[in-house]
Amino acid sequence: MAKKLVAVVKLAIQAGKATPAPPIGPALGQHGVNIMAFCKEYNAKTADQAGMVVPVEISIFEDRSFTFVLKTPPASVLIKKALGIESGSSEPHKTKVGSLTRAQLRQIAEQKLPDLNAHDVEAAMKIIAGTARSMGVTVVD
């Protein structure tokens, strides 16, 4: 018989830097999960993505066991990494902080495609372009 699902916890954690400190400790502790076991597994699976924020969806079962699914990093983080900037513009439609080429946009869209609500790369590119615009980043051909 399948295990009974008790909770699904979604967190965005730095890759390879999960510790039992907040926000991870309290989020998992209230469900009785072994926090250190999660941290070790998460850090092992995300060691190759150092410096990125990797969202994770943790399914917690009745017997206090858990499974987790890693998602792709947020589009804004990928855009900032591609441009080498710290943050987006504080006034996105007035002050521009950089420009993204079509090739960079396609690369980010292909990386995000599994987690986006899009069926092809073109639609994913439009979604990423919208995120870029709201960050004060222009998209150039």
From Swiss-Prot:
This protein's GO CC annotations: cytosolic large ribosomal subunit
Q: Which PROSITE patterns match?
A: RIBOSOMAL_L11
Q: Which GO terms describe its biological process?
A: translation
Q: What keywords tag this UniProt record?
A: Methylation, Ribonucleoprotein, Ribosomal protein, RNA-binding, rRNA-binding
MF GO annotations: large ribosomal subunit rRNA binding; structural constituent of ribosome
Instruction: Keyword check for Ribosomal protein, yes or no.
Output: yes
Cite the post-translational modification comment: One or more lysine residues are methylated.
**Function (record text):** Forms part of the ribosomal stalk which helps the ribosome interact with GTP-bound translation factors.
Q: Which family does it belong to?
A: Belongs to the universal ribosomal protein uL11 family.
Task: Describe its assembly.
Answer: Part of the ribosomal stalk of the 50S ribosomal subunit. Interacts with L10 and the large rRNA to form the base of the stalk. L10 forms an elongated spine to which L12 dimers bind in a sequential fashion forming a multimeric L10(L12)X complex.
What name appears for this protein in its UniProt entry? Large ribosomal subunit protein uL11
